[in-house]
C-alpha cells in the first residue's frame, strides 16, 4: 500500500519530469502562457489597448511596425476560441518542438503567423485575431510528417477526418452566425503540409 513517504519520494521525480518537459518545449510553453496572459488582460479592462497595439497593420503608417505581422496571433476573442487553439498548439506544437528543436519550431510559428495573416488580410482585411493559422500549420506539418514517416507522432485515430471536418465547418460557419478565418486556416494548413514534406525529404536523419 502506498504511504505518505512514497508520495514525498515521488514528488521530486515528478518535478524533474515536468522540468524536462518544459525545457524540451520552451517555445510552446512561452507562447501558450503569453496567449493566456493576454486573454486575461483583455478581460480585465485592457482589450482596447491590446487590440490597438497588436492588430494586423490596417493603415499605411502601421506597415513599418513589424511586430503586428505576428502579434495578431496572440489575441483571442472568446473562451472557446482560445481553448481550441491552445489545446491543439500545446499537444502537437509541443510534439514538433520536442522532436525537431525549439529553433525549428519557432521558425515554423513565425512564418505561419506571417503567411496566414497576410492571406487572411488579402481576403477580408485586417480585422482578424487568433493562433488558428499557426495551429493549422502545426496540424498540417504533423499530418504529412507522420504519413511519410509513420509513428513520428502519436496521432489519435481519425486525425485526418478531424482536420477535414474542422476545415469544412469553417465554410459553413457563416450560416450559423459564426465567422471563422478560413483563409488563415487553409493557408496555414498548406504551409504546414509543404514545410513538413520538405523537412521529411531534406533532413532524413531526424527520422532515423
State each model region's role.
Residues 2-208:
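A detector for small-residue-rich transmembrane helices and their helix-helix packing motifs
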Amino acid at each position: 500500500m502506498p504511504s505518505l513517504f512514497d508520495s514525498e519520494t515521488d514528488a521530486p521525480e515528478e518535478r524533474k519530469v515536468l522540468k524536462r518537459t518544459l525545457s524540451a518545449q520552451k517555445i510552446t510553453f512561452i507562447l501558450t502562457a503569453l496567449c493566456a496572459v493576454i486573454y486575461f488582460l483583455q478581460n480585465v479592462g485592457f482589450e482596447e489597448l491590446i487590440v490597438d497595439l497588436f492588430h494586423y497593420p490596417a493603415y499605411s503608417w502601421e506597415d513599418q511596425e513589424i511586430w503586428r505581422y505576428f502579434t495578431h496571433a496572440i489575441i483571442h476573442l472568446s473562451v472557446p476560441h482560445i481553448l481550441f487553439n491552445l489545446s491543439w498548439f500545446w499537444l502537437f506544437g509541443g510534439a514538433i518542438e520536442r522532436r525537431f528543436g525549439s529553433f525549428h519550431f519557432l521558425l515554423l510559428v513565425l512564418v505561419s503567423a506571417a503567411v496566414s495573416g497576410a492571406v487572411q488580410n488579402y481576403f477580408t482585411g485586417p480585422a482578424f485575431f487568433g493562433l488558428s493559422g499557426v495551429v493549422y500549420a502545426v496540424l498540417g506539418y504533423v499530418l504529412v510528417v507522420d504519413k511519410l514517416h509513420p509513428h513520428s507522432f502519436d496521432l489519435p485515430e481519425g486525425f485526418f477526418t478531424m482536420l477535414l471536418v474542422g476545415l469544412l465547418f469553417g465554410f459553413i460557419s457563416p450560416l450559423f452566425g459564426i465567422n471563422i478565418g478560413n483563409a488563415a486556416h487553409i493557408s496555414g494548413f498548406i504551409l504546414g503540409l509543404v514545410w513538413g514534406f520538405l523537412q521529411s525529404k531534406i533532413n532524413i536523419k531526424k527520422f532515423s
